[in-house]
Swiss-Prot record:
Specifically methylates position 2 of adenine 2503 in 23S rRNA and position 2 of adenine 37 in tRNAs. The lineage of its organism: Bacteria, Pseudomonadati, Chlamydiota, Chlamydiia, Parachlamydiales. Residues 101-326 form the Radical SAM core domain. The active site is at 337 (s-methylcysteine intermediate). The keyword rRNA processing applies. GO terms for biological process: rRNA base methylation; tRNA methylation. One of its GO terms (cellular component) is cytoplasm. This is Probable dual-specificity RNA methyltransferase RlmN 1. S-adenosyl-L-methionine binds at residues 162-163, 194, 218-220, 294. InterPro entries: Aldolase_TIM (IPR013785), Methyltransferase_A (IPR040072), RNA_MTrfase_RlmN (IPR027492), rRNA_lsu_MTrfase_RlmN/Cfr (IPR004383), rSAM (IPR007197). It catalyses: adenosine(2503) in 23S rRNA + 2 reduced [2Fe-2S]-[ferredoxin] + 2 S-adenosyl-L-methionine = 2-methyladenosine(2503) in 23S rRNA + 5'-deoxyadenosine + L-methionine + 2 oxidized [2Fe-2S]-[ferredoxin] + S-adenosyl-L-homocysteine; adenosine(37) in tRNA + 2 reduced [2Fe-2S]-[ferredoxin] + 2 S-adenosyl-L-methionine = 2-methyladenosine(37) in tRNA + 5'-deoxyadenosine + L-methionine + 2 oxidized [2Fe-2S]-[ferredoxin] + S-adenosyl-L-homocysteine. HAMAP family: RNA_methyltr_RlmN (MF_01849). Binds 1 [4Fe-4S] cluster. The cluster is coordinated with 3 cysteines and an exchangeable S-adenosyl-L-methionine.
Length: 358
């Protein structure tokens, strides 16, 4: 029986080396060298000196390894922000966003195709959930950004398509690969996981024994009545429970939580809303990221006037909250916050992925 290929993008260095040595009966340290070369350079062309006297072993390791990553189907830029699409084997699109910065850029990656959270202001939510991404599909996004598009990745944010905690096990496995010192070697504080308020995910995260990523919470409303309308998850986890989860995360990790708040004209953008927001966030170690609403394919909302954005921001700052008003980028290529959707995929049937050896 033919041995299924071992997908290198689905493994930490330890589990990859274990899988190789299990099949060959040797080669643990040599497999780690292959892993390190692939993740740090994007190819294995520099391995020959390390395998000078073990060419047969190298060929055996390579024959057992699946080095494949998904192809780019589209690569767009508006001069400030980039967006690339990856085509999956079941003919779906994974969307990722590149945000250049002076000291290295931020890569916004997806954890699902579609999303079942149904947030009223989000194009992805209107798709519904088609399926979770695999570890290989999540890691392909970074691999392509770094080695095919030559984008300098300093930070990674799970803020693309999907609710990361709805695909918890895979996202956390990807996190461990991203932070593997023999691989990409990103620091845990360079990675942020954003949630719409999935409390099980927050509390599962607190039970992890390894260093944790940063946490962002997409809040978008300062009271239950409004949040119920904008974010259906609030009906399951109302603000009182969400507050406690944020408080517990801050206390147990000593980390500051990022609060994302999409400002929507005449919905959640008044000074009264700002007052309610400061009252809700009182006592929490947070910073606030204000995001002007971005237009979608079938709009029911609008972005506030610039004066409204500035007044809302000023009020929060006056109350002592560290607040950033995000500059709108990526609208023209549908790469801005809330725009990563494809309603044409909504009617696609689920597809069973072939199993790679893990």
């Amino acid at each position: 029986m033919k041995i299924p290929p071992i997908s290198i993008l689905s493994h930490t260095s330890e589990s990859y080396a274990n899988a190789i040595s299990h099949e060959l009966g040797k080669g643990f340290q040599h497999a780690k060298l292959v892993y390190q070369e692939w993740f740090r350079r994007g190819n294995i062309s520099g391995l020959n000196p390390a395998f000078k006297n073990a060419q047969a072993l190298l060929q055996n390791i390579l024959s057992l390894t699946d080095f494949s990553f998904l192809p780019i189907s589209q690569n767009l830029t508006d001069g400030q922000t980039g967006k690339f699409l990856i085509k999956t084997i079941d003919d779906l699109d994974i969307k990722s966003v590149l945000i250049p910065m002076q000291a290295g850029g931020t890569l916004c990656i997806s954890s699902q195709i579609g999303c079942q959270m149904g947030c009223a202001f989000c194009e992805t939510g209107r798709m519904g959930l088609l399926r979770n991404l695999t570890t290989q599909e999540i890691l392909s996004q970074l691999f392509i950004a770094k080695f095919r598009l030559h984008f300098s990745v300093r930070n990674i944010v799970f803020m693309g398509m999907g609710e990361p905690f709805d695909n918890y096990d895979t996202v956390m496995h990807a996190f461990r690969i991203l932070t593997d010192s023999h691989g990409f070697g990103l620091g845990n504080n360079r990675i942020t996981i954003s949630t719409s308020g999935c409390l099980e995910g927050i509390y599962r995260l607190l039970q992890e024994t390894t260093p944790l990523p940063n946490l962002a919470v997409s809040l978008n409303a300062p009271n239950d009545e409004l949040r119920n309308k904008l974010m259906p998850i609030n009906k399951k986890y109302p603000l009182k429970e969400l507050y406690q989860a944020i408080y517990d995360f801050c206390k147990q990790t000593s980390k500051q939580v990022l609060i994302a708040y999409v400002l929507i004209k005449e919905q959640n953008d008044s000074i009264e809303h700002a007052k309610q927001l400061t009252n809700f966030l009182s006592g929490l170690n947070v910073k606030i990221n204000l995001i002007p609403y971005n237009p979608q394919s079938r709009d029911r909302f609008q972005s506030p006037e610039q004066s409204t954005l500035e007044n809302f921001t000023s009020y929060l700052r006056e109350k002592g909250f560290y607040t950033l008003l995000r500059q709108t980028k990526g609208q023209k290529i549908m790469a801005a916050c809330g725009q990563l959707g494809n309603l044409e995929l909504k009617r696609k049937k689920p597809f069973i992925l072939p199993i790679l050896k893990e």
